[in-house]
Every structure is written in C-alpha cells, then in structure tokens.
Curated annotation (Swiss-Prot):
One annotated Gene Ontology cellular component of this protein: extracellular region
Disulfides per UniProt: 27-86, 40-64, 49-75, 53-77
GO biological process: defense response to fungus; killing of cells of another organism
Residues making up the signal peptide according to the UniProt record: 1-25
Top-level taxon: Eukaryota
Annotated family: Belongs to the DEFL family.
UniProt organism field: Arabidopsis thaliana
Keyword line: Antimicrobial, Disulfide bond, Fungicide, Plant defense, Secreted, Signal
Name this protein carries in UniProt: Putative defensin-like protein 39
Coiled-coil spans in chain: none
Subcellular location as annotated: Secreted
Amino acid sequence: MHSKLRVVYVLLILFILFIRHATTTYCEKVRSKTAPRDVCKKSNGNALCKKTCWTIEKYVNGKCLILPKTTNLDCYCYHYDNGSACRA
C-alpha cells in the first residue's frame, strides 16, 4: 500500500513540475517597432537590434531573424512571457 502511495506522490510531483515548466516556456518574439528596417543588413545588425530592444523597447534580448512565414531578415525582440531571457 505504501509503495502505491509513493508512486502516486512522485507522479503528482512530476506532473506539477511539468505544468509549471510548460507555463513558463513560451518565448514571445515581436518585430521591433523602433529599429530601422535596414538594421539587419549592417555588419553589426544583431548588436544594434539587441541594443534597440533592450534600451528602447524594454525586451530582454533582440536578434535579426527570419521567422516562419516571413521571407525577410528583420529585427525581433524576444523574451519569455514571464520576463526572463530566451534563445532565438
């Protein structure tokens, strides 16, 4: 009986951890509203994009990306929906 309770307890903890992890892993990527449209064509485009996202738009990070359903390299600001940094 005790072993079944332990298994249920462990599964419950794993489920709670999974739900908690799943709710904090959405990485929001939005096109920069203030970066010049040709910023990603420059040799230091990623640095300029990141600086714009951090200082002006208050996102954690920024990078020149080609996202799915788009064809142009553009500056995107991004962070997790809880405010922490995420990878592009």
